[in-house]
Amino acid sequence: MGQKVHPIGMRVGIIRDWDAKWYAEKEYADYLHEDLAIRKFIQKELAEASVSTIEIERAINKVIVSLHTAKPGMVIGKGGANVDALRAQLNKLTGKQVHINIIEIKSPDLDAHLVGENIARQLEQRVAFRRAQKQAIQRTMRAGAKGIKTQVSGRLNGADIARAEGYSEGTVPLHTLRADIDYAWEEADTTYGKLGVKVWIYRGEVLPARKNTKGGK
């Protein structure tokens, strides 16, 4: 059987940037565990705030966390109360000075994480899986995507045997490295168990910047 490579991991360093931007030698494992703890904490605290990507940069005793969210008002809170509380909790968690940048996602329907999350929440509310996928596809195509593919897998409609069912519209060129493909995987907790939701969104081509090579013209 043919298996699909992770569309984002395949494009990192070509048209995608890293979500963690730091370098370490002996402290590598400590930093990695700290990154995972930060991401887990933010995803738990801001579960309703439509947070998609969490980027982490490091300097000496300083951590810069950039949150890409469709609901910046919910993250910031009244007079900045929520973001101040989050910063204090992250300072305590890491023992370092944490700076938080909030970046608004202008088109949530073109973000695979948010589209997948929306489908998963609908499945938890007993919306038919076909309807949830087709509605998400229509919204994404209306938002200007070149193509989208979705897949829901598990005990669909409570069936005894798990299966996967997906829909697509437009083109999703998984082999084209310059194709800007956003991918996400989400889970829905239903009464019959967990359902997996996968979303691929093709947003157009990106021409990678030419890198200067030593001795190159």
Curated annotation (Swiss-Prot):
Record carries keyword Cytoplasm: no
Quaternary state and interactors: Part of the 30S ribosomal subunit. Forms a tight complex with proteins S10 and S14.
A GO cellular-component term linked to this record: cytosolic small ribosomal subunit
Pfam families: KH_2, Ribosomal_S3_C
KH type-2 domain location: 38-106
Protein name in the entry: Small ribosomal subunit protein uS3
The organism's place on the tree of life at top rank: Bacteria
Database matches in PANTHER family: 30S/40S RIBOSOMAL PROTEIN S3 (PTHR11760), SMALL RIBOSOMAL SUBUNIT PROTEIN US3C (PTHR11760:SF19)
Example of a GO MF term: structural constituent of ribosome
Keywords: Ribonucleoprotein, Ribosomal protein, RNA-binding, rRNA-binding
Protein function: Binds the lower part of the 30S subunit head. Binds mRNA in the 70S ribosome, positioning it for translation.
Family per record: Belongs to the universal ribosomal protein uS3 family.
InterPro entries the UniProt entry points to: KH_dom (IPR004087), KH_dom-like_a/b (IPR015946), KH_dom_type_2 (IPR004044), KH_sf_prok-type (IPR009019), Ribosomal_S3_C_sf (IPR036419), Ribosomal_uS3_bac-typ (IPR005704), Ribosomal_uS3_C (IPR001351), Ribosomal_uS3_CS (IPR018280)
Single biological process term from Gene Ontology: translation
Species this protein is from: Streptococcus uberis (strain ATCC BAA-854 / 0140J)
NCBIfam families listed in its UniProt record: rpsC_bact
KW RNA-binding (keyword) present: yes
Phylogenetic placement of the source organism: Bacteria, Bacillati, Bacillota, Bacilli, Lactobacillales
Gene3D superfamilies: 3.30.300.20, Ribosomal protein S3, C-terminal domain (3.30.1140.32)
